[in-house]
């Protein structure tokens, strides 16, 4: 019994994988689909998500990020046509760029945020002092017969 299947993954941009795989997991519209050799024929849309496959010759797990598409399973193999896709190294590079960008943004805002936090703390302290003064003044002006709990 054959333990691998022909798998082709293509996108508008490029052919991403063409070879034999032990299995592939794709994000189907109704949930994750695990496809093994000799799977029943199937034609379905896929939703955005991660495609995971195990390369038959090497046993290496590979991951791709897809932005939707179509999956066809036939006797001849599996074909995934993705609207758009990224290989894991491209995805890692994208994440690295995004992390650097976020860190740069944070550094640029850091001094400003601290200044705002300090201003907020000062404003709160001033407000609390004004509230304390208000209650102190209100208590001084209150006549002895106006005290809460006294019968009038």
UniProtKB/Swiss-Prot annotation:
SUPFAM superfamilies: Epsilon subunit of F1F0-ATP synthase N-terminal domain. Keywords: ATP synthesis, Cell inner membrane, Cell membrane, CF(1), Hydrogen ion transport, Ion transport, Membrane, Transport. The keyword Cell membrane applies. Signal peptide: none annotated. The keyword Ion transport applies. GO terms for molecular function: ATP binding; proton-transporting ATP synthase activity, rotational mechanism. Pfam families: ATP-synt_DE_N (PF02823). F-type ATPases have 2 components, CF(1) - the catalytic core - and CF(0) - the membrane proton channel. CF(1) has five subunits: alpha(3), beta(3), gamma(1), delta(1), epsilon(1). CF(0) has three main subunits: a, b and c. Belongs to the ATPase epsilon chain family. Produces ATP from ADP in the presence of a proton gradient across the membrane. This is ATP synthase epsilon chain 2. It comes from Burkholderia orbicola (strain AU 1054). The lineage of its organism: Bacteria, Pseudomonadati, Pseudomonadota, Betaproteobacteria, Burkholderiales. The gene is atpC2.
